[in-house]
Amino acid sequence: MPFRAHPFRQRGFSLLEVLIAALIFAIGLLGLAGLQARMLAAANSSYERSAAVMSAYTILHAMRAAVMSTTDPGTRSTLAAAYVSSDWRCSSPSGSTLPLADLKTWIDSMRGTSTNPPLVHPSACGRVTAIDANTFTYRAEVCWNDSAGGDNTDGGNCLGGKPATIISVTSRL
């Protein structure tokens, strides 16, 4: 029998090698799926933050329109003060005055209604505070439960100390 330099040469892959490669590939796919899920949560959080900024500007513009509708300084101050609250408004106010109607529209748009989806989040709350009433400088704040990025755990936030996101816009009317 003649001597062969390579009596047995393996060809192809063994079943064990194929199974290990499939396992590594599956773990990689699970990692990609997790990464995509986190990316979608971050994109949703970004959308909510943008909507909250637009919403804060909306109430400040409504205040500006109401205040500028009169030339009487006393009436201007009274109108502006009607928007102000130190507490978070998490439900729509009732009433027939222009400030209450504006606040109702603002809260309803942020939280959504039975016929309209929420602009920000169903847990959204808002408030307007006076920074300097003499110069008509006010701050509009929007607070909501942002599970992807809420980091404000102050006991005075709209969720009573649970992690929340608060967007704040200050403007002079």
Predicted regions and their residues:
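Flexible, low-complexity segments enriched in proline/glycine/serine and punctuated by aromatic residues
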Residues: A41-S46, S50-L173
